[in-house]
Amino acid sequence: ADATDVYRHTFPRMAAKTKQFYERYPIDVERAAAVADILQSRKVALPNGDPLTVERFQCLGSDFGMKPSFERVHWILDQAFLDGDGSASTSAELSDEFLSSVMDATSSRPLYWPLQEFIYANGELETPICWAAQRVRGEHPEFAGDIRPLNFTGEAMFPWMFEQERALRPFKPAMDVLMEDTHFGTIYDADQLARNEVPLQAAVYFDDMYVDSGL
């Protein structure tokens, strides 16, 4: 599978995971919507100076593939508003605790995201990767930042990350070149692997959010 195939499986799964999250914590439907409305109406900065946008807020969904996934995001939303009683308010300021938690949960490891989609680039490609996650996201309007209930996104790399996150900005020129390239080295030899005589076993989660088990 290539990166596009992977995301065409995982974006629908993320919509399903978001639905499960809201079913477990119905109060967070309103909270997440209120946070997104605030982020769309005015500029909000994280403690490190990075802008907190709706797209970055949606990336909290990366937790949905682990434990305690739903609980961790619920705890973050529980402290979102300065009034402190957990109620949603588009007129309230977002709390320092919330902003710090979102920053920690969505801050990128600098070498992880630049390589993320290229693990699927095994040798010469017929077409460039060209920001696979962003392209597939465009096929799913339900992930737009102004859609309610707000859908969260999973483990996916988007071009805005290399503009908004200071740790990733130095990689942007290289990413712009690589995303249009089709010439990559061979990561693995499929023919040699097919001839392997050493018994191997692998396990995968049935409903893995990151790489669909059907692939």
Regions found by a protein language model. Give the residues of each.
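Conserved alpha/beta-hydrolase "acid-adjacent" motif
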Residues: 69-72, 209-214
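A structural signal for short secondary-structure junctions
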Residues: 192-197, 211-212
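Alpha/beta-hydrolase fold active-site neighborhood
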Residues: 43-181
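A short, acidic, amphipathic alpha-helical segment used as a generic capping/interface helix at domain edges
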Residues: 181-192
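A catalytic-pocket lid/entrance helix-loop region that shapes and gates access to the active site
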Residues: 2-40
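Short beta-strand/loop motif that positions the catalytic acidic residue
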Residues: 196, 201-204
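Conserved catalytic-core segments centered on acid/base and nucleophilic motifs
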Residues: 1, 200-201, 209-210
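Short, flexible loop/turn elements at secondary-structure junctions
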Residues: 65, 204-206
